[in-house]
Structure formats: C-alpha cells, structure tokens
Amino acid sequence: MAAPRPSPAISVSVSAPAFYAPQKKFGPVVAPKPKVNPFRPGDSEPPPAPGAQRAQMGRVGEIPPPPPEDFPLPPPPLAGDGDDAEGALGGAFPPPPPPIEESFPPAPLEEEIFPSPPPPPEEEGGPEAPIPPPPQPREKVSSIDLEIDSLSSLLDDMTKNDPFKARVSSGYVPPPVATPFSSKSSTKPAAGGTAPLPPWKSPSSSQPLPQVPAPAQSQTQFHVQPQPQPKPQVQLHVQSQTQPVSLANTQPRGPPASSPAPAPKFSPVTPKFTPVASKFSPGAPGGSGSQPNQKLGHPEALSAGTGSPQPPSFTYAQQREKPRVQEKQHPVPPPAQNQNQVRSPGAPGPLTLKEVEELEQLTQQLMQDMEHPQRQNVAVNELCGRCHQPLARAQPAVRALGQLFHIACFTCHQCAQQLQGQQFYSLEGAPYCEGCYTDTLEKCNTCGEPITDRMLRATGKAYHPHCFTCVVCARPLEGTSFIVDQANRPHCVPDYHKQYAPRCSVCSEPIMPEPGRDETVRVVALDKNFHMKCYKCEDCGKPLSIEADDNGCFPLDGHVLCRKCHTARAQT
C-alpha cells in the first residue's frame, strides 16, 4: 500500500446546532459516482485507492482477523500539502438519503473557529499501549453532497425518533475532541510505522472519553483504537487531489471553498432525555470514541459481515440507533379521584353543607312516614273473592277462578279445607276439594260408582256409557234402539221380541219386525195372532186378505176359512 500524501491544514470549529463549520470557497470538482453499494449483497468490493484505509465489519464478541502484513505501513502524512493528499475514506458510498426538509440554524462565523486539535500521541512502549493511526485526509469535493445528505438524514431521523421532541440548545457547545471519526475493526499505520494492537489486546472500553485541548497544529488526526467488541465501520476513500472543502449543515449543497479553511468537526447532538454520549460524537485517542457505540448495544452489529465495505460511520450509526433510542420514563398520571374533586358517595371525608342539609331532610321525612303511615289505596280488583277485604301488596294471595283470595279464605265450599297447592274443582263458581266434589256427582244405576266423566241418562237414571247394556245379551245400547220391560230393564230389540213378543198361532214363532224395519205387523183374528204370511185358509191354504171383502176371512166354528170353504162346510 502506498503511503498517503500529506493532507492539507484543517482546523476544527465547534458550533451549537451545526455539525460542520463553514470553510472558504474552493473550485467545484465533479466527483465520481460510487460503483458499488456496500449494503447490497452480491456487489463486488472496489479496489482500494492508494493511501486508503479499510474498516472491517464484524459481530459483537467476534475476534477480528489480524491486519494484513503483506503491505508495509506508510509514515504519517506531512502537514501543509493539500494538493495530492489521499483520503482514508473509500470512494464507495451507498445511495444518499433524501435531503432533509427542515431548516438548520445559520452557520457560525469564522471568528468562532477554534484552533485545530493536536495530533494523537504515538505509540511508545510495549504492545499493550494504544497506537495512534495516521491522519485521514479530507474527502475530495465530490463527496460533499453525500456527506451533507447523510448528516441531514441523520438529524431528521434523530428528530423523528425523539419522543419528547428534543432539540439541542442553541447555547450549548460541546467540548472539542480529538477524532471526529473512529474505526474499530482495522488499524492505520502510525507515524513510526508500528502496527497497532489487535482488538483483543486493547484497553478496557469502560474508560471515560478524554478531552484533549486543541494545539496549534495545522492538520487533523483520525485515530483508530481497537475495542474488545468491534463495531462495523465503513471504507471511505477520499482523494486530496483537489482543494479541501468544508460542509455547512445549514444548506443542502455546500458552495465550493476558495481557500483552505479549518476542518469541520462534529458537534454531538445529545438528547435532553438521555445522558449517554451520542453515537455521532467524535472519539478520543485510545479507542474511547467507540465506547458510546458499545454502551448503546445495537443488535444490528451482529448481522453485519466482516469484510464488506459499509457507508460512512455516522450514517451507519444512525441506522442502528433508530430502534434503540433511550426514552424518558413517562410520569405516572395522578389517579382519577385526585383530578376530579367530586367525592363519590359513601367515601370517607367531611360532608359539605349541602350534603348535611339533604341528610337532615331525608331523616325528617323518614320519621314522618313512620309516625303517620299512609293507607294503601287498593283497587277494586285487589279485593279478596270471599271476604271482600283488601289485599296488601306484601301479603301472599291465591289467584283462582279469575279472582284473588287470601290463603285462609281459599277453602273448600263444603268441608272448609284449605285448597292452596291442591287440586280443586269448580262447581257453580265455588271451589270444592276432590272428595266433596265426588260426593256431589251422580252414581251409575248399574255399578253404583259416581260418574266423573261421561254420563248416559235413560229411563230417568244415570249410567256410565259402558254400563248401559242389554240385560239379556249384555250388548252396549249406547247409540242404538232399546226396549225396556215391565221391570224397567233395558233390552235390545231382538232379545225383547224373543222374550216378550206374541207368537203366531200357526208357526208358534214370535211376531217380530221385518229386517230393516222397526214396526211389527201382525194379524189378529179369532183372538189369535198370525204372521202376515201365516194368515191363510185352513182348508185350502189361500192367503186371506185383511180387508172385509170376498177374499177376506170367513170364520166357522173357530176356523179361519175363505168364503168357498166356508160355504162347503156349512152345506155338509
């Protein structure tokens, strides 16, 4: 690796809200665009520029590889030569973030510029002492837009992530420090050509940040101190073939300077709600600049590769500081009862005058109601159905037969038994118990049991439907014709005729109605009963007519004869 050329004289200025101090104008130089996006996987790594340094990205707790030994360590650049100085920052940059929209305060005047910081002390002694790296030359004019955009995006994100809308006070000026940038995973050659210590041999990261006063030296030294827990850094290439330029955070695009001016210096933006040092504050010699990053403990450092180039340290730190903004503890709101002064009813505490008056009125009203109870106005339908006395609302009552009764009044009409919760029968509008109601029922003439269901009444007597049958054949007579005998017993028609019908004097059979007819037709002659079919002449058997004509009956000596036979017998 070729030795870097001497960097131009740079002075550091400190301003309250600004990140960079204004410098004199220089001629504009077109910067080459980055060819590789270090954050995009798969892009090849650009070749390092002469005099460039490399920062390796690793994981927390991972031992970084030792620095390459195949290149000699160059001596530190000399001050005053700003024409051909090679920057230690790589030329590969990620796409710039969108420009910030909010305005920044004006840049400080040149009278407020502080003298440049002194160079870091060189390594003396054993390998345990920290080795200061060679100074990093300023970036050429082509990277000014990228740095301004990165700082603008950084400030915008910090403002949006602040829950309390923290702003840096305009009167606050942080003390100057020695190194605006700090590299963690790789080292730079020292002035004496001695390699720096590896990260595992670096001093403890818990040391405070030393503040070094700015001596009267015309160049800014960028120190690198390895830490036990390396943070991912970026490779930046800055070529000093052109004149150095300065950045002013008050404008999106800084004008080119015309003459060398003091180098810019970071102003740490410290939120008012956290005392932790900002990620973007410059570190001190000896690796103390990386301690704020270790305190923040960003988890994104674990996922970064160890060999891929990264964007500038301040941009990369902003991307990892977003999820870990330290928030201020929200004050606990006072309880609701403290905010509302109205006391809830029943809560302990002194009573107001209005509450005391209301309590006295309620007490007097209660005493009056107890001394003079009012009679309840009972409606007409709330009278007892038997005693016709009013029913109190709190008194239990029985609703039956469409009326209300006192429990003592709802009893059987015959035996005075209480009927509450029991089965009762209504007879002529009066309640009866089951026993008394059964006694009032008619009994069957056949079986002698009370008729509780259907009743059949015949010949002036009551019967169960299944008990009203023929006394001869026991066939039910419900719905059919029946005949009663002299003893008032029911008979079916066939059985009655068989038993009580007159018999024919010819065939000696009972004279019964013909099938399908209810009437019985018989012929009576000579005090004898005849069927219609049996009414004939005894001698010739000729059917006789019931009419008094020549075809009628001409009796003779007790015989039924026709006229011809009658004449014949009479002549003999």
From Swiss-Prot:
PTM Phosphoserine: list the residues. Answer: S116, S142, S143, S169, S170, S259, S267, S281, S288, S308, S344
Instruction: Report the residues modified as N-acetylalanine.
Output: A2
Consequence recorded when altering F93A: Reduced interaction with ENAH and VASP
> The organism sits in which domain of life?
Eukaryota
Q: Which residues carry this modification: N6-acetyllysine?
A: K265, K272, K279
- What Gene Ontology cellular component terms go with this record? actin cytoskeleton; adherens junction; cytoplasm; cytosol; focal adhesion; nucleus; phagocytic vesicle; plasma membrane
Output the CDD domains linked to this UniProt entry.
Answer: LIM1_Zyxin (cd09349), LIM3_Zyxin (cd09435)
Q: What is the effect of changing F114A?
A: No targeting to focal adhesions and reduced actin-rich structures
Q: Which GO terms describe its molecular function?
A: metal ion binding; RNA binding
UniProtKB keywords: Acetylation, Cell adhesion, Cell junction, Cytoplasm, Cytoskeleton, Host-virus interaction, LIM domain, Metal-binding, Methylation, Nucleus, Phosphoprotein, Repeat, Zinc
| Modification Asymmetric dimethylarginine occurs at | R253
Subunit structure, as described in the record: Interacts with HPV type 6 protein E6. Does not interact significantly with E6 proteins from HPV types 11, 16, or 18. Interacts, via the Pro-rich regions, with the EVH1 domains of ENAH, EVL and VASP. Interacts with the first LIM domain of TES. Interacts with NEBL (isoform 2). Interacts with SYNPO2.
Q: What does this protein do?
A: Adhesion plaque protein. Binds alpha-actinin and the CRP protein. Important for targeting TES and ENA/VASP family members to focal adhesions and for the formation of actin-rich structures. May be a component of a signal transduction pathway that mediates adhesion-stimulated changes in gene expression.
Q: Which family does the similarity line name?
A: Belongs to the zyxin/ajuba family.
Could you tell me what this protein is called?
Answer: Zyxin
Species whose genome carries this gene = Homo sapiens (Human)
Organism lineage reads as:
Eukaryota, Metazoa, Chordata, Craniata, Vertebrata
